[in-house]
Structures are given as structure tokens and as C-alpha cells.
Swiss-Prot record:
Compositional bias of kind Basic and acidic residues: 1-19
Miscellaneous field: Calcium is required for ligand binding.
Official protein name in the record: Asialoglycoprotein receptor 1
Family annotation (Gene3D superfamilies): Mannose-Binding Protein A, subunit A
Modification Phosphoserine, positions: S16, S285
Sites where the protein binds Ca(2+) 2: D216, D243, E253, D254
Coiled coil spans: 61-123
Organism name: Pongo abelii
Membrane topology (Extracellular): 62-291
Keywords per UniProt: Calcium, Coiled coil, Disulfide bond, Endocytosis, Glycoprotein, Lectin, Lipoprotein, Membrane, Metal-binding, Palmitate, Phosphoprotein, Receptor, Signal-anchor, Transmembrane, Transmembrane helix
Record GO biological process: endocytosis
Subunit structure: Interacts with LASS2.
Transmembrane annotation, as ranges: 41-61
Length: 291
């Protein structure tokens, strides 16, 4: 009986093993369940904690570096601002000093110009006085040579014609310079009032461009001594004056001159032409005024 029971139990075990082999191995547990079980969960938590700690340390280090750089930038900006303010203040001070120096120099320059103007006026008076003295002396010499007979006379190197005295240049000047030269001689640029005077002047100037005392720089044509132009003598070339602008020297033609044939033409006042000065005979021989 016992042996039979043992055989049945052995057979039952074999059938049980055979049944398990037919069913296969037991199903495996999910990955998350295995990770969250026991020691594995502890290790995972520890790893995440370490990773978080590393991230916090890195961020803290970077934040510290950024704050350090920000402090450096603030300090640099503060120094730059202070330096700029100091430079601006220095430039402002220098500008004030330069302005004061410029005002001082302007005052000195104005004073020097005033002194030069006064000296120039005084020099012109002395020159005119010298010219008058020279004319008076020449007339006195002429009177002595004429056995004491008193008569009006022209200065030395001046030519007498019809109660006027004429001086003919041998060099060239611009019209304004020639006009000033005649004024210093207590005379004026020649004013032609008749055909006889035209022929006289033309005879002495020859075929050379020569300035006369006629211009239209301020509007209408006029003579420098106030002689009426509209009703007076004229000897213009055909189609003159034309106030031509094509010469390339700027402006028109505002000053009159004798041409090579004696007739008149208007031209640029800056051209260096010869000129003729004229003064009245009685004026040339009068006694100089006392200063």
C-alpha cells in the first residue's frame, strides 16, 4: 500500500511538472514596478538628488560670476562717467579761457585798427600838404624864372591845357587805385568835356588803353567831379558801353577808358591800365593851407 501511494505521488508530481512546462515561465513584472521596488528606488532618488545638486551648484556659480561681471561693469561705467564729466568740465573751463582770450585779442585788434586808421588819415593829410607845398614851390620857382611875374602854374611834370593841369602815367593800375592816386595829388581822374580836350588827351596818351574819370559802379554813368554825363560830351565806340559779362573776371564792365584810337569803351575796373589825372590850374598854384 505504501509503495503504491509513493508511485501515485511521484506520478502526480511528474504530471504537475509536465503541466508547468506546457504553461511556460511566469510573466515578468513591469520596469517601473521593478525600479520603484526596494533598493532600486533608493538609488534612483539618490541619483536625482545628486543631479539636482550639481545643477544648483552650476547655476549658483554662473550667477556669482554674472554678479561679479555686473559689479565690474558698474564700476567701469562709474569711472567712465566720472572721467567724462571731468573732461567736459575741463573743456568748458578751457573754452571759457579761450573765449576770454579771443575777446581780449579782438579788443586789441580793434584798437590797433583804430590807431592804424588814425595814422593813415594823418599820413594822407601830410602827403596832401607835401603835394601842395611842392606845387607852391614849383610856382614860386616859375615866378622867379619869369622875372617875378605872378601867374598860375602847374606842378612839375604836369602839362597845362585850357586852365587845367594834366598828369599822364607810364604804368598801369586798376581804376580804383588810379582814382586814389589822383586824389592823393589833390586832383581827379580826367574828365573830358569837349572835343578839344579829347584831342589833347589822346595826343598825350597815344594808342594805349587809359582810364578816365567815368564809371557806373553805383548805377548810372557819372563823372568823378560831378560833371553832368547825360548832357555832356561823349565819344563812345559803336555799340558801347555794353556792360559785357563774358570776360570771365566776374561782374560786368563799370569803368570807362580811352582805347587805342581814342574812343571810349567800358571795361572791367580791375584791369591795370594807364591813367590821367586832372586838376584846375588855379587850384594847383594856390598857397597851401596852414595846419
Amino acid at each position: 500500500m505504501t509503495k503504491e501511494c509513493q508511485d501515485l505521488q511521484h506520478l502526480d508530481n511528474e504530471e504537475s511538472d509536465h503541466h508547468q512546462l506546457r504553461k511556460g515561465p511566469p510573466p515578468s513584472q513591469p520596469l517601473l514596478q521593478r525600479l520603484c521596488s526596494g533598493p532600486r528606488l533608493l538609488l534612483l532618488s539618490l541619483g536625482l538628488s545628486l543631479l539636482l545638486l550639481v545643477v544648483v551648484c552650476v547655476i549658483g556659480s554662473q550667477n556669482s560670476q554674472l554678479q561679479k561681471e555686473l559689479r565690474g561693469l558698474r564700476e567701469t561705467f562709474s569711472n567712465f562717467t566720472a572721467s567724462t564729466e571731468a573732461q567736459v568740465k575741463g573743456l568748458s573751463t578751457q573754452g571759457g579761457n579761450v573765449g576770454r582770450k579771443m575777446k581780449s585779442l579782438e579788443s586789441q585788434l580793434e584798437k590797433q585798427q583804430k590807431d592804424l586808421s588814425e595814422d593813415h588819415s594823418s599820413l594822407l593829410l601830410h602827403v596832401k600838404q607835401f603835394v601842395s607845398d611842392l606845387r607852391s614851390l614849383s610856382c614860386q620857382m616859375a615866378a622867379l624864372q619869369g622875372n617875378g611875374s605872378e601867374r598860375a602854374c602847374c606842378p612839375v611834370n604836369w602839362v597845362e591845357h585850357e586852365r587845367s593841369c594834366y598828369w599822364f602815367s607810364r604804368s598801369g593800375k586798376a581804376w580804383a587805385d588810379a582814382d586814389n592816386y589822383c586824389r592823393l595829388e589833390d586832383a581827379h581822374l580826367v574828365v573830358v568835356t569837349s572835343w578839344e580836350e579829347q584831342k589833347f588827351v589822346q595826343h598825350h596818351t597815344g594808342p594805349v588803353n587809359t582810364w578816365m574819370g567815368l564809371h557806373d559802379q553805383n548805377g548810372p554813368w557819372k563823372w568823378v567831379d560831378g560833371t553832368d554825363y547825360e548832357t555832356g560830351f561823349k565819344n563812345w565806340r559803336p555799340e558801347q558801353p555794353d556792360d559785357w559779362y563774358g570776360h570771365g573776371l566776374g561782374g560786368g564792365e563799370d569803368c570807362a577808358h580811352f582805347t587805342d584810337d581814342g574812343r571810349w569803351n567800358d571795361d572791367v575796373c580791375q584791369r591795370p591800365y594807364r591813367w590821367v589825372c586832372e586838376t584846375e590850374l588855379d587850384k594847383a598854384s594856390q598857397e597851401p593851407p596852414l595846419l
